[in-house]
Amino acid sequence: MKKIILLFSLIVLIGCKSKKPDTTTEAIPEVVTFVRLTTTEVDANLKTKAYQLGKRILMTCNTSKFKPFNKSEATRSVIDNITEEKLSKTCAKFRQRYGDFKDLKLMQIYKDNETRTTIFRYKALYTKAVANKELRVYMNDQSQVSAIKSMDWSDTFERKLFRNTDTDTE
């Protein structure tokens, strides 16, 4: 009989679920790294410089002449990566699909507080109506182009793979 009571007690003890402590996890506040800026919040010289450098890249498609960036205009990685050969290949595709480049229209400006980069979103205007392209010019805190990216235009801003800016100042 003692064995049956002991076995029954053991089964009851194992069968009882222990009550989990009521732990509430605090919601970690989401860190906002991108802030949309108005055109008046950005220095006029920086806007002009971003526009001119972005336009210089796309005008290469019309003129076939590219003036390379210097150290005061762009970071070392941008200078090394933008070559006349690479631009020629890209321009050949763009001219065939979209026609001649006309101009850039500034649509939005964002500040990435994590990398201290100002991102200028331009809509690239071409002669063919089917063209719906975006040119992003990333300017670091030394007013240098740290990246340039061309993609299809989207009304919503997305990070689009660019993470690490080159911050050399040589």
Regions found by a protein language model. Give the residues of each.
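C-terminal motif of bacterial Sec signal peptides marking the signal peptidase cleavage site
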Residues: I14-G15
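Exposed beta-sheet edge and beta->alpha loop/turn motif
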Residues: K111-E170
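Short, low-complexity N-terminal intrinsically disordered segments enriched in polar/charged residues
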Residues: K19-T63
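Short secondary-structure boundary micro-motifs
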Residues: V42-A44, N62, A92-F94, L106-I109, ...
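Short solvent-exposed beta->alpha transition segments
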Residues: K67-R116
